[in-house]
């Protein structure tokens, strides 16, 4: 897909996200097997340097803390509770996709189970490319669990099987990334399904 249709990024609930996420939610949005699969992917990709966790919360799914972990999200209470975080930033990416960091600040940018909520994902990923060092990775993991009223309509309109290609296309349109890699990490028969899309900063 070279462009997204009109209405793709509309949502059922168009209230500001700062209102929706005002109350902290100390829950995980994946089951234990899917969380373990996210952690295993991070290990396989060697995400041990300076990492930015976009749309983060009280937990980041690293088995071992990276050298530094900057968590960016909407709820300060959740971010403050994240034990691996070395820096915390409250920022609404749907209000402003511009990341408040210098060029080349990070070795990896991760987004776990939140890419479906972005109304300007291509701009956010272009910003991710800007703040990544050459050779760094953008890593998106996602399942079929979500707050459906906050997910964009385009995401809801395509099958689970096609969603990884949507995320890959977001990366292509963002520019500055090598061809994205797509993998289904868990098939969902015994746990939450899990897909991963990652791309290296050129």
Show which residues each predicted segment covers:
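Conserved class I S-adenosyl-L-methionine
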Residues: 137-169
């Amino acid at each position: 897909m070279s462009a997204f249709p009109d209405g793709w990024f509309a949502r059922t609930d168009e209230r500001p996200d700062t209102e929706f996420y005002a109350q902290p939610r100390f829950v995980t949005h994946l089951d234990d097997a899917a969380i373990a699969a996210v952690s295993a992917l991070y290990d396989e990709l060697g995400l041990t340097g300076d990492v930015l966790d976009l749309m983060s919360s009280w937990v980041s799914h690293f088995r071992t803390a990276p050298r530094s972990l900057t968590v960016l999200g909407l709820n300060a209470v959740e971010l403050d509770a994240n034990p691996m975080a070395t820096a915390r930033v409250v920022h609404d990416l749907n209000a402003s996709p511009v990341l408040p960091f210098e060029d080349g600040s990070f070795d990896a940018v991760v987004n776990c189970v939140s890419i479906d909520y972005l109304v300007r994902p291509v701009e956010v990923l272009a910003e991710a490319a800007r703040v990544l060092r050459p050779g760094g990775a953008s890593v998106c993991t996602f399942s079929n669990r979500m707050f459906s009223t906050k997910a964009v309509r385009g995401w809801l309109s395509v099958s689970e099987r096609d969603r990884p290609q949507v995320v890959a296309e977001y990366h292509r349109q963002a520019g500055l990334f090598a061809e994205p890699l797509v993998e289904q990490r868990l098939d969902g028969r015994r746990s939450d399904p899990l897909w991963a899309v990652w791309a290296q900063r050129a």
